[in-house]
Structure formats: structure tokens, C-alpha cells
Amino acid sequence: MAPAVGIDLGTTYSCVGVFRDDRIDIIANDQGNRTTPSFVAFTDTERLIGDAAKNQVAMNPHNTVFDAKRLIGRRFGDAEVQADMKHWPFKVVDKSGKPIIEVEFKGETKQFTPEEISSMVLTKMRETAEAFLGGTVNNAVITVPAYFNDSQRQATKDAGLIAGLNVLRIINEPTAAAIAYGLDKKVEGERNVLIFDLGGGTFDVSLLTIEEGIFEVKATAGDTHLGGEDFDNRLVNHFVTEFKRKHKKDLSTNARALRRLRTACERAKRTLSSAAQTSIEIDSLFEGIDFYTSITRARFEELCQDLFRGTMEPVERVLRDAKIDKSSVHEIVLVGGSTRIPKIQRLVSDYFNKEANKSINPDEAVAYGAAVQAAILSGDTSSKSTNEILLLDVAPLSVGIETAGGVMTPLVKRNTTIPTKKSETFSTYSDNQPGVLIQVYEGERARTKDNNLLGKFELTGIPPAPRGVPQIEVTFDLDANGIMNVSAVEKGTGKTNKITITNDKGRLSKEDIERMLADAEKYKAEDEAEAARIQAKNGLESYAYSLKNTISEGQLQISEDDKKKVSDKIDEVISWLDNNQTAEKDEYESQQKELEGVANPIISAAYAAAGGAPGGAAPGAGAAPGGGAGFRNDGVVEENEELD
């Protein structure tokens, strides 16, 4: 079995790494890229994931899904979800409060949860690792933004389950990046390191103290809804307005035009990290109008000014929470593709009065750290690196219960090191109260109505007593994934009740996950069948054409009658191919067998007459994928071909 892997499941791109033999490999996909777009596309015939999905997005905008990370673990009514829906060409619908993605797939309307879409991306990452490692990958560490809440973490874990992975741990992205930095740098003495992680869709800042392999997170802050895509949106809006001004037409009504514009904006943004200005040229963007324009780095910075400036607020909050002065930060590490933007780098270096550290690859650092953690958690003690690391992470948000009058009483304060267990004793609010409702909230506000309800349960059967007499002990147990168990016990009777906060409102049930796992297997089998079908079609096509070339080149002594017989059959097959692009695999194979049945005896006889053929005279593409007879390119008869 292959070793455990680390997967950085990103909003826009994902990355997978493995730690073995004392080194990290960041694994390239089948296109040779070390990061894979977090895109899934559905067409009339197949499902595409990664580069193949992103490459066809302009032709198929309504059925190409991305940004699942901006939906996962959220409610349909969330302000962010509603705002994002304006930018997405795919359809998101409300299903009992959860956002569900709706697409056309093989001529039918299909619905997928964000967890399922994310699981497809995870499956692609898993397959990328399996191709490299040559074995089945079962265990993985998956990363999430440090500021992800309980339901977002749980939903990410579910996505891993649907992808058939045993999720060893959900770890925070900046913490994973800190491991990459710590291993890369071989840090001496105690260092305060600030990780500034700005990716495609999320932003995290974490402050860690690193000393002799102990990585202790002191504080974390961020915005689970800020990243490169928001900068792209600003550019898109800017150019939509410009197009309207120049041509009096609104292209925002056309999904394909918008997608082409967005792709150009993303490219322009990247160019502006190294050039002071760039041009955008899109032929026939909308209603036949060519759109040629340019943008300077200064204008781009102005368009995103508030977003860029806003990244400093979490930095200040982290320093406040950790009670560390900015002059005591030894090293600032930039992670995430968006930290390549010069303005961001300048804001950070101006704030700290020192240059940020750019020694680690911003796209790969998170997967790198996750791979190390995967090796540690799967018990790999072969290396000094894995033996000496201890990770102490924190809870990103305070968690507590509602007490009389809707007051939030936190039991676990934000930035508490996890795993942790905290207990507190409460009592009843009125005389002879038979039970209490325990409501668990997450957030920093003083009143529960302003925080996020994680779940609730009742403790009943409390014997009649005056208010304030019964002793109810509530215990919060926060595990290393940042996922919560809450229990309550009434001391007098020993009555207990507990809940694992799996966000009952939004969480997938066990049955849902099992159904989605079965669906995932089904889609995978369909993908493989489609690949085999296309291989059979291509095999038949190349066999027919190479046979045609062999006949027409006239190198073989074949009678005119035989030549006509073979040529007619080839033309018949090519014409059949043109009209049957969606035929089944066995239909292509039987066509190939028929063609071989006509051609092989004639060509074999011609070879025999010629006393063996010169190299390369035989038709290429030989056997069908099913292993039918044929010739190899070197003129040698395949072993299963009988010669008369």
C-alpha cells in the first residue's frame, strides 16, 4: 500500500505531496502540472476534472463547477453565498437551507452537494498520487483555512470520505506552511514566525513560535472569503463597465463572454505581478465585437485598494491576540499565489519594516507541510524530520453555550491550544425546572443571536428543586481536527447526554455519505468506460487511415481487384465512423475486426510475395484495444495473426 499523502484542497487550485525516504515530493498531474485546477465539468458524454475541466470552461460555462470551497459547510442564505452566486455561471439552488449545485450531465439535470464536487477534486489528487506511487492511496491529511468554522471542517472531512479516503487529520493551511518553512530553514532557537497566507479564495494569518521541532500556534485570524478571485472580480467589473461605455452593450448577460473575460483578467493579474502594464485582446467577445484594451499595475492596485488594505487588519488582530509586538516577529512567510502581487508584498514589508521571506514556494508549501504531517500521523518514524515535530494548533473561534437572557458564555476561548477539554458547572433558571436545553454556539459576540449555532440537545429528568440548586456540568471536548464533542451531566442523578457537533442542520448524514460514495464509484466507472470507448474509436480511425496510406503508396504488389476491395471497405468504415461518433466500444471493435478480416489476408499475401516487407510498410495502429489482430509499425506480424 502506498504511503499517506498531504492534500492542499484549494479554492482555485489543489496540490498533493508525499513524504518518504526523508524527502518530500510534490506530485505532478497527468498534464505535468504540480497544481491542479479545482474544477469539475459535466458534458453530454463525460465528466472532466482538473486541467481538462478548466480548459473547456468557455465552451461549457453553465456546467463547469469551481469554487466549491466557497460553498462547503455554508448555508444557502449566507451573505457570501448570495454575493458569489452573482459571479458564478453555474446554478446554485436551495435544498432545505443547503446550497446545491445543479448541472446538465449526459442530457439530465443532476444535483451535487459542495462536498461531492470537492470529493471529485480530491479523487483526482488521489489518482495523481497513485499514478506516481504505483499503489492505492488510502490515508490523507487534508488542509483547510485556519479560520474555517466547525461545519466547514466537518464538510471537508466528509468530502474526503466520499472520495474514499481515510482522513487522518484536518490541519490548518498556515500551520502546514509553517512546517514547510521550519523544515526548509532548520530553525535555531525560538523564533516567532508570522504566516501570511493569501490564496485564490481564502486568507489566513497565523503567528507561531517554532523551537526545536515544536510548532506552537499562538493566534490565528483571517477571512474565509478573500483571495485572488475577488481581485479578478474587480477587474471583470471594471472591464464590463468599460465595454458598456465604449460599445453601449452589456456583456454581463452572456456567460461565455464573461468567462472569456474572466480568464483574460486572471492572466492580466498574473502578468501585472512582473510588468507595469499589460494588454487584453479578446476577439469577438460579445455580439461580434473585438475587445482590445490595456491596464496598468497602478490601476489594478487602485481597483483592489480596499481589499489589499483589508489584509492588514487580521495581521494586527493576531499580534494583539498573541500579545506580541510586531518588532518581535522574526520572520514573515508569504504563502498562497496571491502573495506574488507586489502591492501585497509592499504592504507587509512596510508594516513590519522588513522584507518578507520568499524562500518557500507559495503554491506548494501547504501540501508540503500536509505531507509531513501525514507521514507523522501514519507512524512513519524513519526520518529525523518526522520524529522531532510536534504541532500545537489552536481553535480559531470561541465556543460556548447560551445562558439566561441569550448571553454567550464561552467555555473554550479562541486561540486555545487544541486538542482541549474544558468543563464548567451551570444550574437551572427557574424552580422545579425538569430539563435544560443546551445550545452550543461559536463566535466572538456577547449575544448568542450574533454567533453561529452549532447544535443543541436537551438534558431531561432533573428532579424538582429550587432554581440554582441542580448542578449541571457541561464539558467541551475539542479534538485535533477542530471538531467538537459536548456532554452534560446532572451531578445529583448522574443523568447524562451528549452531542458531537456535526452541525445537524448542514451536515451530511451517514446515509448521504454512503450514497455519494456509491455515486462516486459509478461516475469513476463511467469515466473509465468513456476513456476505453474513445480509445477504441481512435484505434479504429488510425488503423483505417494508415491502411489507406499503405494501399495508396503502392509499395505492395496488390491486384487492382484486391486494392478496390480493401479501399471500398476502408471508405465504408470511415463513412460509418463519421456518422457514429458516439457508438459503443464493442461497435468500434467489431468494425475493426471486419476491416481486418478483409485487409489482413490480402496484405499478408502481398508481404509473403514480397519476401518480407521493408520497415514501416505495414499499416500502423495495429491491434484494436480489445487485442484484435493487426500489424505493428515495424512490419512484423502480431503474434495472434495466423498466416496462410
UniProtKB/Swiss-Prot annotation:
GO terms for molecular function: ATP binding; ATP hydrolysis activity; ATP-dependent protein folding chaperone; heat shock protein binding; protein folding chaperone. It holds the Pfam family HSP70. The keyword Transferase does not apply. Residues 610-644 are annotated as: Disordered. InterPro entries: ATPase_NBD, Heat_shock_70_CS, HSP70_C_sf, HSP70_peptide-bd_sf, Hsp_70_fam. The keyword 4Fe-4S does not apply. Induction: Up-regulated when grown with elevated levels of potassium chloride. Involved in osmoadaptation. Belongs to the heat shock protein 70 family. This is Heat shock 70 kDa protein. The lineage of its organism: Eukaryota, Fungi, Dikarya, Ascomycota, Pezizomycotina. The gene is hsp70.
